[in-house]
A protein has these predicted regions:
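Conserved active-site/ligand-binding neighborhood in enzyme cores
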Residues: 1-686
Length: 686
């Protein structure tokens, strides 16, 4: 696998259309990410590169089979992966923008909308009829990314050397890419592209301890990961690693079934700020319209008949009798197929989130081979669908013992190791709680998929023994299945107990119990993970937001220029609003006075020696002398006086600093707004 960076330099404005407008000033806008930074999605880039390759094939420069081998077909994914193209240092900028929540003053003004304005200029166009005259009601505006911006996309190609036809094709199609986005045959979207080898980042190979039966990891999604759920499923991890083991010849076809049966891939759930979250238990409730308190019914909380309760949702972590909750950021993307003319949507887990899970096996050799895959790929993995463009790229980090995220309080006594038999269970009054951490598929005594109480008890006997009774069950049922990418067909669907299911049992004779492990069917894909615990002494929990108090001084380095431009734009907007608000009182303003401001404005704009404000004052004093010009002098002084009042009206310290650091530009905006407003005033008056 070779990795390269495709650099895209905009030689003209570009509208890499998202298919929507902003609803007010622009009919079509370019594509931006969640932070407001411009982006060229990988699917678009890959399509453009393929168009160039097919153009070369149609004229006989290359074979069509080479194009299909590199870019893929309907039945074959190809050997190339094209990542999203972003501006330089995009990841560091996003990290700093996330930290802005710690600074109260910045947090109020830095948002995706204001950042988009930094990277957007407005262009307009209209339709011309056969007589060469503009049609009525046909004016359209476009939000475009200005020329000069550079984008960088990571491209991976599954070859061992650059001295091959596949790499030469990639290099040629990148060099021949000349236009991107809307109206690229009418001046927009002219680009210059070149390919260069990526710098190899330092990577510390992960190792497994002798005799260890598990690997614990953290996955950080770099791109969005195609998924219909809000977690990374064990089946997607299983599919990725099995394919990698086969392609790298670490296992043979005859070892696949052995690997599938002996390696368990758990689901990976959200992990934030050192806290490991689990699916919300189905016995946890809130009072309706009150999300600040949580009540665990199965742990003994008695519902008040005068209150209405609803099931809690999301993911949770309990620490020190406080409950923390986490929501997963999901997104829906719409795409258009050029060949079939179909509009379709893709559901995905948003990038920039972390998930943690484990891989278990009694066969250490399989775990070593999985680690070898991770190390060979420098910790980069691709999960979910559409792995060849735009989606799927993530990083995986193996957790050492000292780096393990905090477990929930109701699990803190567990060593939390697969196959470990712990002695932490007390079973007060002989009662225990079994919780399912993932969807669980059960077969009854005759091998038929079932979720009735008898089937549940039949399967629980394998971990609790024969002498127990079920007292309470909090559960829901779901249908689980999947898709077999090798056979291009859906898998069989099963009825399962939903993750978060809780079962209260009473054991007559407590014996050694395996407190955590897997039960039921399809364990290798993450189904059936469970834990056994005692009833909690506390069954009411206060909710605490998983965040940090806002503090001053957020870390800003790479995002400094962007934040400065946002503050400058806001300062200019304040100047313009100030003009509009003041102009209602300009009832005695003559048209000649306004028109005489225009040459003063132009002269100040062309003066390269003096600042704009000084040049304007100098021009007025030199050219508008005498009693006849008193009106224009007084009006100019009034404009300057009103401008000087703006400083005291700006509340935000960052915007005020930008206003004072760019007073000449601010005054130019202020004066231009006065002239524009005056023209509109006299146009309406006529």
């Amino acid at each position: 696998m070779l990795r390269y960076i495709l650099t895209i330099n905009l030689l003209s404005d570009m509208c890499c259309g998202s298919g929507v407008g902003n609803g007010s000033s622009q009919d079509i806008i370019s594509s931006y990410d969640n932070y407001g930074l411009p982006i060229i999605y990988g699917r678009r880039l890959k399509g453009l590169l393929r168009d160039n390759a097919e153009f070369m094939a149609n004229f006989g420069y290359i074979e069509k089979t080479l194009v299909d081998r590199v870019f893929g077909t309907v039945s074959s994914p190809g050997i190339i992966r094209v990542g999203n193209a972003q501006i330089a240092d995009a990841e560091e900028i996003k990290s700093e923008l996330s930290d802005i929540s710690k600074d109260i003053s910045l947090n109020k003004i830095i948002n995706s909308g204001n950042i988009e304005e930094v990277f957007t200029v407005t262009r307009t166009a209209t339709a011309i009829n056969d007589e060469g005259v503009a049609d009525d009601q046909q004016l359209r505006s476009f939000g475009v990314v200005p020329k000069g911006v550079k984008f960088y996309s990571e491209i991976e190609i599954d070859v061992n050397t650059d001295n091959c036809a596949e790499y030469r094709l990639l290099e040629d199609v990148c060099k021949s890419l000349r236009g991107i986005g809307l109206n690229r045959n009418r001046g927009l979207g002219r680009v210059e592209c070149f390919l260069q080898a990526t710098k190899v980042k330092a990577y510390e190979n992960a190792e497994i301890e002798i005799g260890s039966t598990e690997i614990e990891y953290i996955i950080e999604t770099k791109d969005s990961v195609v998924s219909t759920g809000d977690y990374i499923s064990g089946s997607s991890l299983q599919g990725y690693f099995i394919n990698q083991l086969l392609s790298k010849k670490l296992i043979g076809e005859n070892e696949v079934q052995d690997c599938l049966s002996k390696v368990i891939f758990s689901n990976a759930y959200i992990c934030k700020k050192g806290k490991k979250y689990l699916p919300m238990t189905l016995g946890m409730f809130n009072i309706k319209n009150d999300k600040d308190s949580f009540y665990s019914i199965i742990d003994g909380y008695k519902m008040d008949d005068g209150k209405q309760y609803v099931k809690a949702k999301g993911y949770y972590c309990i620490l020190d009798d406080r409950i923390y909750t986490a929501d997963i950021k999901n997104k829906t993307e719409f795409h258009f197929s050029k060949k079939t003319k179909d509009l379709y949507k893709i559901s995905a887990i948003d990038g920039g989130q972390t998930f943690t899970g484990r891989i278990y096996s009694d066969n250490t050799e399989f775990l070593k081979k999985i680690l070898k895959v991770i190390n060979n790929n420098k910790g980069i993995i691709h999960l979910g669908g559409s792995v060849n463009a735009q989606y799927a790229q993530s990083s995986i980090t193996i957790i050492k013992q000292d780096d393990t995220p905090k477990d929930n309080d109701n699990n803190k006594n567990n060593k939390d190791n697969y196959n470990n038999k712990n002695d932490g269970i007390k079973a007060k009054d002989g009662r225990l709680i079994v919780e399912f951490l993932s969807d669980t598929v059960f077969m009854n005594s005759i091998g038929v998929n079932a979720v009735d109480e008898e089937s549940i008890k039949y399967n629980l006997c394998k971990i609790l023994g024969e002498e127990f009774s079920i007292e309470e069950i909090y559960t829901e049922t779901v249908k689980v299945g999947g898709y077999n990418s090798k056979w291009k067909a859906p898998k069989r669907r099963y009825l399962a107990l939903k993750k978060g299911t809780q079962i209260l049992v009473k054991i007559d004779n407590l014996q050694e119990i395996k407190e955590q492990g897997f039960i039921g069917f399809l364990n290798s894909e993450g189904y059936g993970e469970y834990k056994v615990r005692d009833l909690l002494e506390c069954n009411e929990f206060d909710w605490e937001e998983d965040g940090q108090d806002a503090v001053k001084g957020a870390r800003i380095d790479k995002a400094k220029d962007i934040i400065s431009k946002v503050c400058k734009n806001l300062a200019e907007r304040i100047c313009q609003i100030r003009v509009v608000n003041n102009f209602d009182n300009e009832t005695n303003l003559s048209a000649s006075t306004v028109m005489r401001l225009i040459p003063a404005f132009k002269a100040a704009d062309m003066d390269e020696k003096k600042g704009f404000m000084d040049a304007f004052i100098s021009y007025v004093s030199k050219n508008y002398k005498g009693e006849n010009n008193k009106g224009i002098r007084d009006y100019s002084n009034k404009i300057i006086e009103e401008f000087n009042k703006i400083d005291s009206r700006i509340a935000n310290k960052y915007v005020k600093a930008e206003f004072n650091n760019n007073k000449n530009e601010m005054f130019r905006t202020f004066l231009q707004a006065y002239i524009t407003q005056a023209k509109l005033y006299y146009k309406e008056k006529r």
